[in-house]
């Protein structure tokens, strides 16, 4: 067994089980640095085990479908139903069988600082990705519920021509009129890894669009609020009026459109 604290730390990094004999051997080492390293590694392993358990639970829908013979399960989710401005964006993602991506979760539960990293991990591992975007004008024409469906259908259509085609759809709280077997899952982005993958792809895609709109239409805080009705956004509406990306069927934009004193 290594004796220097530096060597012990290096040995601990290779340990992946809480039952490893090295932990028991080091428990009798009275040096503060050793005990600190020991507890740190044990905590890290516990964190990894908890993450593995969480990911395994989020594969329950997929594993049940694999047992039934389905091979290419697509997760589908959308982002942007509630904002006053910008599009609704949906993504359709097919991950390899039993694929686990550390940190992947409902995009609302992932710290913003980690969005890009997990998004890139999904892009690297996914067998196929489709993205559907429905702009504010069509949202106003058909309503946000129907626009969400259209975005999801467009995301599925974007898979055409890719090597992997879906034989089953797991959809976040929605049923689609399409000839592919499917299941609607309430809070699917928190209960299915495939849907969670679609959630982060849709989220990052839309956030990038809104950051670009923030440069085109400054004063509304689009890069920070993604078009939601924050205080800064509402103040921008009062100060500068409605932009071409605002949803005129959503309040308070709708009332501003009816007010002849506003553009």
From Swiss-Prot:
<dbReference type="InterPro" id="IPR024567">
    <property type="entry name" value="RNase_HII/HIII_dom"/>
</dbReference>
<feature type="binding site">
    <location>
        <position position="77"/>
    </location>
    <ligand>
        <name>a divalent metal cation</name>
    </ligand>
</feature>
<keyword id="KW-0540">Nuclease</keyword>
<feature type="domain" description="RNase H type-2">
    <location>
        <begin position="71"/>
        <end position="262"/>
    </location>
</feature>
<keyword id="KW-0255">Endonuclease</keyword>
<protein>
    <recommendedName>
        <fullName>Ribonuclease HII</fullName>
        <ecNumber>3.1.26.4</ecNumber>
    </recommendedName>
</protein>
<comment type="similarity">
    <text>Belongs to the RNase HII family.</text>
</comment>
<keyword id="KW-0963">Cytoplasm</keyword>
<dbReference type="InterPro" id="IPR022898">
    <property type="entry name" value="RNase_HII"/>
</dbReference>
<comment type="function">
    <text>Endonuclease that specifically degrades the RNA of RNA-DNA hybrids.</text>
</comment>
<feature type="binding site">
    <location>
        <position position="172"/>
    </location>
    <ligand>
        <name>a divalent metal cation</name>
    </ligand>
</feature>
<dbReference type="InterPro" id="IPR012337">
    <property type="entry name" value="RNaseH-like_sf"/>
</dbReference>
<dbReference type="GO" id="GO:0003723">
    <property type="term" value="F:RNA binding"/>
</dbReference>
<dbReference type="InterPro" id="IPR036397">
    <property type="entry name" value="RNaseH_sf"/>
</dbReference>
<keyword id="KW-0464">Manganese</keyword>
<dbReference type="GO" id="GO:0004523">
    <property type="term" value="F:RNA-DNA hybrid ribonuclease activity"/>
</dbReference>
<dbReference type="GO" id="GO:0006298">
    <property type="term" value="P:mismatch repair"/>
</dbReference>
<dbReference type="GO" id="GO:0043137">
    <property type="term" value="P:DNA replication, removal of RNA primer"/>
</dbReference>
<dbReference type="GO" id="GO:0005737">
    <property type="term" value="C:cytoplasm"/>
</dbReference>
<dbReference type="InterPro" id="IPR001352">
    <property type="entry name" value="RNase_HII/HIII"/>
</dbReference>
<dbReference type="GO" id="GO:0030145">
    <property type="term" value="F:manganese ion binding"/>
</dbReference>
<dbReference type="Pfam" id="PF01351">
    <property type="entry name" value="RNase_HII"/>
</dbReference>
<keyword id="KW-0479">Metal-binding</keyword>
<feature type="binding site">
    <location>
        <position position="78"/>
    </location>
    <ligand>
        <name>a divalent metal cation</name>
    </ligand>
</feature>
<keyword id="KW-0378">Hydrolase</keyword>
<dbReference type="GO" id="GO:0032299">
    <property type="term" value="C:ribonuclease H2 complex"/>
</dbReference>
């Amino acid at each position: 067994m290594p004796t220097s604290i530096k060597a012990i730390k290096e040995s601990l990094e290779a340990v992946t089980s809480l039952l490893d004999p090295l932990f028991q051997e080091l428990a009798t080492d009275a040096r503060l640095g050793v005990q600190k390293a020991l507890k740190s590694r044990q905590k890290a392993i516990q964190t990894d085990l908890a993450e593995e358990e969480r990911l395994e639970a989020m594969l329950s829908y997929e594993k049940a479908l694999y047992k039934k013979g389905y091979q290419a399960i697509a997760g589908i989710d959308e982002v942007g139903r509630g904002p006053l401005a910008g599009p609704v964006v949906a993504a359709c993602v097919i991950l390899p069988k039993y694929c686990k991506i550390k940190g992947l979760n409902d995009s609302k539960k992932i710290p913003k600082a980690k969005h890009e990293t997990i998004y890139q991990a999904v892009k690297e591992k996914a067998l196929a990705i489709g993205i559907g975007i429905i702009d504010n004008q069509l949202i106003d024409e058909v309503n946000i519920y129907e626009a969400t469906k259209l975005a999801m259908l467009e995301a599925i259509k974007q898979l055409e021509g890719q090597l992997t085609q879906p034989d089953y759809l797991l959809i976040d709280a929605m049923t689609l009129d399409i000839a592919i077997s499917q299941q609607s899952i309430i809070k699917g982005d928190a209960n299915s890894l495939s849907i969670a993958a679609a959630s982060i792809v849709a989220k990052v895609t839309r956030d990038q669009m809104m950051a670009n709109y923030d440069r085109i239409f400054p004063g509304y805080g689009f890069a920070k609020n993604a078009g939601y009705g924050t205080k800064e956004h509402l103040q921008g509406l009062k100060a500068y009026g409605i932009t071409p990306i605002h949803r005129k069927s959503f309040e308070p934009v709708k009332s501003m459109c009816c007010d002849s004193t506003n553009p």
